């Protein structure tokens, strides 16, 4: 969240006496600004303070990723996380980055990755836990289609081999074979 974004949220509350209801609205607006930008675990709050100075101080706890864990968190799992997620441990937790990583994993047809965000050990930290119930990573299909031309033969026999995550990098390998079908 940029300084100008926060100034826009704070402006209506500046240079005036604020009631407790106004303070609640202020906090709500600031937290909404963080959430709207994807920072769902970042929170603003008011600490006890002396209001005789006629100013208030908002405290912001940045929501950070303690770790992103996949399955048993083996080296293979960590490699998959590294290649799928644009963020990692110690970074600000932006739900859009986490969703992007999940989408990268789920682009493989054999994956069904889901996430859960839970509190970390330190204030402001969260653990992103990924579970992935995979299906068979190999598929083989045969077919006949009429997408050929008169020069290649109208009917085409096809064979397709798809292998997901062969190198454990969220990779997809596809091998296609087409051949003109014989007319009987």
Question: How would you name each of these model-derived features?
Answer:
Residues 14, 165-166:
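Short amphipathic alpha-helical signal-transduction/dimerization elements
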Residues 166-172:
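Short loop/turn motifs that connect adjacent beta-strands in outer-membrane beta-barrel proteins
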Residues 151-153:
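A generic structural micro-feature
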Residues 1-148, 160, 177-184:
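Periplasmic polypeptide-binding modules associated with outer-membrane biogenesis and secretion
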Residues 155-161:
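Hydrophobic, lipid-facing positions within transmembrane beta-strands of outer-membrane proteins
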